[in-house]
């Protein structure tokens, strides 16, 4: 089913599902909260796709030890949701191979698949089966990148023809679900590989195929700096949705070639306005630093280190010059998009990478002026200013209503708040009151279903999109788990 049509139908249908008298809906209060009884909504054990002893252990521990029983119930449903419902694991050619769908869309996004398994990394050191599953994701992502570095989503069946083939003017190959060029699609696999290696010390996924994929990543980033030409990628779609197609013959609006990487689409899969997507370029900067750290520590890919260093330096310098702009209220802030000519947008989108999520994604190895993690750096102050702007009415996609408040975006439409943004707000906050506020918003957002949704209406949680969206579920679990370990009193 086409994603836009699916979103429209799911928002309209959600109220009908609840009105139809489901067990969960019957137990729901006016704000989406539940009474003393919490129905079983997690998929039956016999039908679960994958079981991790480490994940099950932490689920039991959290649910038993926190006072907020509704949050405990939500954690039990949400945290294992990726493993329960979206992974397809097997051994292929002697190597683990893991295909990860998003939930209700049977395709593997490079971004979502990385983000969906990321919250399990902290548990995989002592769970060999979980390690193998994540190794399988790393292997499959390398295969996908080598198939087409400009594609954002893939099928398991490499011969399957996408429904978008009939409408998309781009080089669509069999096995590709969608071919929207998004910088973050190539950053997330680096983040996952680096995180896995740091926690486990396991070198086995980083073989010749992975190195070939990393070479392709670097070459694609360099090509999309467009210093010499527009490059081989263009994209147009026959559609009534302007955000689903790219203007000017599919190459986007003009830019001044300053060293930033062009992105035709945002992580929401919506087209960019100005092709220099700043949060994605900052993510690329962190990813390049992580990649170089791995190459040097593992003594592999020595021919790639120089290219990665040159790109990192180029992107860093261009960001320092073009990413930070003066806002009339907040002072120096990060722009969301820019074009190198001085044009930029003041906004944020809920999808990650976002400006709000910069501390969540930034590499700890990066300590340059753009660091948002080190208080003595310029980037830290700029981020704090930006954060205040984003969480206010001065962000055109910050919505506030009777049911909650948070950042949305064009993808699900106006007045639709994405739980992803509330979760990221909580994960990046150092203020216990703000963390508690985010937990309460999320607790009240699930419309009695027991899971996070892609988005919900600011005035009515019963109007939501995508009832099965594994990324939001697992990320919610990560937020609860972090709070449990660092501020357990907030869960009482």
Task: Show where each model-derived region lies.
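Hydrophobic core segments within long, regular secondary-structure runs in both alpha-
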Residues: 72-80, 117, 121, 131-145, ...
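Aromatic-rich carbohydrate-recognition surfaces in CAZymes
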Residues: 106-242, 469-484
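Well-ordered alpha-helical scaffold segments within catalytic/enzyme domains
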Residues: 54-67, 115-128, 188-203, 282-301, ...
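Twin-arginine (Tat) signal peptide motif
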Residues: 1-7
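N-terminal export signals
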Residues: 7-28
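Low-complexity, Ser/Thr/Pro/Gly-enriched N-terminal "stalk/linker" regions
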Residues: 12-13, 31-111
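Extended ligand-binding clefts on enzyme/binding-domain cores
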Residues: 110, 146-157, 171-174, 208, ...
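C-terminal capping/lid segments that line or modulate ligand- or cofactor-binding pockets
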Residues: 168-175, 179-182, 345-376, 414-492
């Amino acid at each position: 089913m086409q994603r836009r049509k699916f979103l429209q139908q799911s928002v309209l249908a959600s109220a009908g599902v609840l009105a139809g008298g489901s067990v969960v809906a019957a137990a729901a209060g006016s704000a989406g909260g539940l009474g003393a009884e919490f129905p079983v909504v997690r998929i039956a054990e016999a039908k679960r796709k994958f079981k991790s002893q480490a994940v099950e252990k932490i689920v039991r521990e959290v649910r038993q030890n926190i006072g907020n029983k509704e949050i405990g119930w939500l954690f039990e449903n949400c945290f294992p949701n990726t493993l329960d419902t979206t992974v397809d694991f097997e051994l292929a050619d002697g190597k683990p191979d893991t295909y990860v769908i998003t939930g209700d869309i049977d395709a593997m996004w490079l971004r979502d698949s990385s983000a969906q398994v990321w919250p399990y990394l902290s548990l995989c050191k002592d769970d060999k089966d979980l390690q193998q599953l994540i190794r399988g994701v790393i292997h499959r992502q390398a295969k996908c990148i080598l198939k087409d570095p400009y594609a954002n989503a893939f099928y398991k069946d490499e011969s399957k023809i996408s429904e978008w083939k009939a409408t998309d003017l781009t080089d669509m190959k069999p096995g590709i679900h969608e071919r929207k060029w998004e910088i973050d699609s190539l950053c997330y696999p680096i983040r996952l590989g680096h995180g896995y290696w740091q926690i486990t010390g396991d070198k086995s996924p980083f073989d010749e195929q992975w190195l070939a994929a990393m070479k392709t990543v670097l070459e694609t980033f360099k090509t999309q700096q467009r210093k010499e030409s527009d490059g081989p990628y263009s994209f147009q779609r026959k559609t009534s949705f302007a955000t689903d197609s790219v203007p000017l013959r599919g190459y986007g609006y003009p830019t001044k070639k300053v060293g930033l990487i062009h992105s035709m689409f945002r992580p929401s899969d919506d087209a960019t306005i100005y092709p220099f997507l700043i949060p994605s370029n900052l993510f690329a900067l962190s990813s390049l630093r992580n990649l170089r750290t791995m190459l040097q520590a593992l003594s592999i890919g020595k021919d790639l280190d120089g290219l990665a260093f040159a790109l990192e330096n180029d992107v860093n310098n261009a960001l320092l010059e073009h990413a930070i702009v003066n806002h009339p209220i907040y002072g120096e802030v990060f722009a969301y998009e820019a074009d190198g000519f001085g044009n930029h947008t003041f906004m944020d989108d809920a999808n990650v990478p976002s400006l709000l999520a910069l501390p969540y994604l930034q590499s700890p190895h990066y300590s340059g002026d753009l660091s948002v993690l080190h208080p003595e750096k310029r980037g830290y102050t700029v981020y704090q200013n930006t954060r205040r702007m984003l969480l206010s009415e001065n962000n055109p996609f910050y919505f506030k209503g009777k049911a909650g408040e948070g950042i949305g975006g064009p993808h699900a439409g106006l007045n639709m708040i994405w739980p992803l943004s509330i979760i990221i707000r909580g994960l990046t906050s150092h203020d216990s009151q703000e963390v508690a506020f985010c937990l309460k918003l999320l607790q009240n957002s699930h419309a009695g279903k027991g899971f996070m949704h892609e988005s919900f209406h600011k005035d009515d949680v019963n109007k939501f999109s995508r009832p099965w969206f594994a990324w939001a579920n697992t990320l919610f679990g990560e937020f609860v788990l972090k709070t449990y370990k660092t501020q357990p009193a907030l869960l009482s």
